[in-house]
């Protein structure tokens, strides 16, 4: 799910945009899939836990429709309707019996969850998707044409010198459309996940955190609390999957949910988000690292230890103190996120979310100058600013995967007119309220308006 800069007005789907897309799609797929038909998109594994179905099939549909150049709001609305229809049906025909090996495990070790056949479920879902598209070709519901704020988001990610790309990111401007929220508050969600020990945990988090957030009762009243709980619940879900499939990976993560004139962020580990306002860095969060005294004390109180090797590590292994996954390092590596909220005044320039492959070599105070310099050279275009920031980190010696996402909160041309360069090393820590609250292997560059 990728996309993009807010304008002063909302965006509504053009009169012919939705029917035109549906006409083209249904020309290529004129009938539901038969049992012999190949699936048009990759299936998410061989089995799914019942609680995983909504998020995994949502990801499948958004990937498929995005590959067909569906407008993001249209893809989200169609996906939501198809998911809603599927979840009202009896899914018991897709139940899979446990493997013999799992049956023989000790009772206390057994992962008790209903497993469903992913391929059969995906085929049934594609046919729900086809049915919705056929219905909407005749008449598009008004809910699918609801206004959506326009965004400019610049994203760039590289594998760098690492053997595998373990980062994942999410850019979801059509949050309301995807989850059927019909109130007057515009919502957009952005996230970066930095995996380690494999990509499974990062991919899982990029699929499930926002879906879990959408189901939290606090989403409408306390969005930061909803994000915090979404991280915790996603960690619990992934730990079940990890035990079932013998996965050992983990992921840090950071996300931002913009709800009208408010910003809510949540984070786990050392991925970070900063806000730049009138050329000044506004500190929103403190990353979780083993060397932080409070983190070190928490780990030691649980019976673990923090040691300095090439860097500070938990129990001599992991260089992060909080993460989704890392099943064999729980509870020392915590799955409890922190969160914060702040009101937006309209003077904010942009958000920047990135993994430690960027922030380890590019200090916060340099970012406004780097972005401003890019905008000057590009005459106010911010489309490729993330690519330049990634290049800066790589040239400074970062060997890690690098992902950078810049979410503009004002038109980049306005930032040039206002001289948003920042004052050297100035950094503000303004009013943050702490609350209890598909990639290519080598590189991805996504910069678009939506």
UniProtKB/Swiss-Prot annotation:
GO terms for molecular function: calmodulin-dependent protein phosphatase activity; metal ion binding; phosphoprotein phosphatase activity; protein serine/threonine phosphatase activity; protein tyrosine/serine/threonine phosphatase activity. One of its GO terms (biological process) is intracellular signal transduction. SUPFAM superfamilies: PP2C-like. The keyword Hydrolase applies. Mn(2+) 1 binds at residues 194-195. Residues 433-450 have a biased composition (Polar residues). Disulfide bonds: none annotated. Residues 152-409 form the PPM-type phosphatase domain. Binds 2 magnesium or manganese ions per subunit. GO terms for cellular component: cytosol; nucleus; perinuclear region of cytoplasm; protein-containing complex. Mn(2+) 2 binds at residues 194, 356, 400. It catalyses: O-phospho-L-seryl-[protein] + H2O = L-seryl-[protein] + phosphate; O-phospho-L-threonyl-[protein] + H2O = L-threonyl-[protein] + phosphate. Its EC number is 3.1.3.16. The keyword Isomerase does not apply. It is an enzyme of class 3 (hydrolase). Its cofactor is Mg(2+); Mn(2+). The modification Phosphoserine is found at residue 450. Keywords: Apoptosis, Hydrolase, Magnesium, Manganese, Metal-binding, Phosphoprotein, Protein phosphatase. InterPro entries: PP2C, PP2C_BS, PPM-type-like_dom_sf, PPM-type_phosphatase-like_dom. Belongs to the PP2C family. Dephosphorylates and concomitantly deactivates CaM-kinase II activated upon autophosphorylation, and CaM-kinases IV and I activated upon phosphorylation by CaM-kinase kinase. Promotes apoptosis. Associates with FEM1B. This is Protein phosphatase 1F. It comes from Rattus norvegicus. The lineage of its organism: Eukaryota, Metazoa, Chordata, Craniata, Vertebrata.
């Amino acid at each position: 799910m990728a996309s993009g800069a807010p304008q002063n007005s909302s965006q509504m789907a053009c009169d012919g945009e939705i029917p035109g897309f549906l006409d083209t799609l249904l020309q290529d797929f004129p009938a539901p899939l038969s049992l012999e038909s190949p699936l048009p998109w990759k299936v998410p594994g061989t089995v799914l836990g019942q609680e995983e179905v909504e998020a995994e099939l949502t990801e499948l549909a958004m990937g498929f429709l995005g590959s067909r150049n569906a407008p993001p709001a249209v893809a989200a609305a169609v996906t939501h309707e198809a998911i809603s229809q599927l979840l009202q049906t009896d899914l018991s025909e897709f139940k899979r019996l446990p493997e013999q090996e799992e049956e023989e495990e000790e009772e206390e070790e057994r992962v008790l969850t209903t497993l469903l056949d992913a391929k059969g479920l995906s085929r049934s879902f594609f046919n729900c998707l086809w049915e919705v598209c056929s219905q909407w070709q005749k008449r598009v519901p008004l809910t699918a044409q609801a206004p959506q704020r326009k965004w400019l988001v610049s994203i760039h990610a590289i594998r760098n010198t690492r053997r595998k790309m373990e980062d994942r990111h999410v850019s979801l401007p059509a949050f309301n459309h995807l989850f059927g929220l019909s109130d007057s508050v515009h919502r957009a969600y952005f996230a970066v996940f930095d995996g380690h020990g494999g990509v499974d945990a990062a991919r899982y988090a990029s699929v499930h955190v926002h879906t879990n957030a959408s189901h939290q009762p606090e989403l409408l009243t306390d969005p930061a609390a909803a994000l915090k709980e979404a991280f915790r619940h996603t960690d619990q879900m992934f730990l079940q999957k990890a035990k079932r499939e013998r996965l050992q990976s983990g992921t840090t993560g950071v996300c931002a949910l913009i709800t009208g004139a408010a910003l809510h962020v949540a984070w786990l580990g050392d991925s970070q988000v900063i806000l730049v306002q009138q050329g000044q860095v506004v500190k929103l969060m403190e990353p979780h690292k083993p060397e932080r005294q409070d983190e070190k004390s928490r780990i030691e109180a649980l019976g673990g230890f923090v040691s300095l090797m090439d860097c500070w590590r938990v129990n001599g292994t992991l260089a992060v103190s909080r993460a989704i996954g890392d099943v064999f390092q729980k509870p020392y590596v915590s799955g409890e996120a922190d969160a914060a909220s702040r009101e937006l005044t309209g003077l904010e320039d942009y958000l920047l979310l990135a993994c430690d492959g960027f922030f380890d070599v590019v200090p916060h105070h340099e970012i406004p100058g780097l972005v401003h310099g890019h905008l000057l050279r590009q005459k106010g275009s911010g489309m490729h600013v993330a690519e330049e920031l990634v290049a800066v980190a790589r040239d400074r010696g970062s060997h890690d995967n690098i992902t950078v996402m810049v979410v503009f909160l004002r038109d980049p041309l306005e930032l040039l007119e206002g001289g948003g360069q920042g004052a050297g090393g100035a950094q503000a820590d303004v009013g943050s309220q702490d609350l209890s609250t598909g990639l290519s292997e080598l590189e991805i560059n996504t910069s678009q308006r939506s």
